[in-house]
A protein has these predicted regions:
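Conserved phosphate-coupling serine/threonine residues in phosphotransfer and NTP-handling enzymes
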Residues: 21-24, 88, 157
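Cytosolic catalytic headpiece
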Residues: 1-72, 76-82, 99, 113-116, ...
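Acidic (Asp/Glu-rich) catalytic motifs at the cytosolic membrane interface
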Residues: 67, 93, 155-156
Length: 175
């Protein structure tokens, strides 16, 4: 139940495809995949196979997040663009992972929302700094404003946008 709800929330927040990679048998993998609602599953997958599959997905242009908890997941966790381990997982999985979740799977949704908010803020600030600095450069070049004023405004806008970057993220969950 928890896994199905988490996957539905992740899809609402931009996750396009969920693939389950497991060392379990075909029957066990199919049963779990159907129960939780993954898009695709692969059974009887060895650790090196998980790593290879991650790299194939990346080579095809996908950004890959790997969630794992065991020693066998460690190579794939290391290869993924974003890797998440559970607190109760193996020491090596937690060490290799970018993020260790201290609790339940619902925290994956929070992490995804934080990532979405961070990317949105980075893009907004990037466009703001390019816009402001372009205007100030143009103003200085055309003598609409003095060069010293343009340089001052450039630095002031950079500082103001840097301060904005430090503000708390506005995280909105889609339900």
């Amino acid at each position: 139940e928890e896994a199905r709800e988490v996957l539905e929330s992740l899809r609402k927040n931009g996750v396009k495809k969920v693939i389950m990679l497991t060392g379990d048998s075909e029957n066990a993998a199919r049963a779990v995949a159907e129960k939780i609602g993954v898009d695709e599953y692969r059974s009887q997958v060895l650790p090196d196979d998980k790593n290879r599959i991650i790299k194939e997905l990346q080579d095809a242009g996908s950004t890959v997040m790997m969630v794992g908890d065991g020693i066998n997941d460690s190579p794939a966790l290391a290869a993924a663009d974003v890797s998440v381990a559970m607190r109760d997982g193996s020491d090596i999985a937690r060490e290799v992972a970018d993020i260790t979740l201290p609790g339940d799977l619902y925290q994956l949704v929070t992490v995804k929302n934080m990532g979405n908010a961070l990317i949105k803020k980075i893009n907004k600030n990037h466009m703001a700094i390019i816009g402001c600095n372009s205007l100030f450069m143009l103003g200085g070049i055309t003598n609409v404003i003095g060069l010293n004023t343009a340089a001052f405004l450039h630095n002031a806008s950079t500082m103001a946008i840097s301060v904005d970057s430090m503000k708390q993220l506005d995280i909105k969950e889609k339900s």
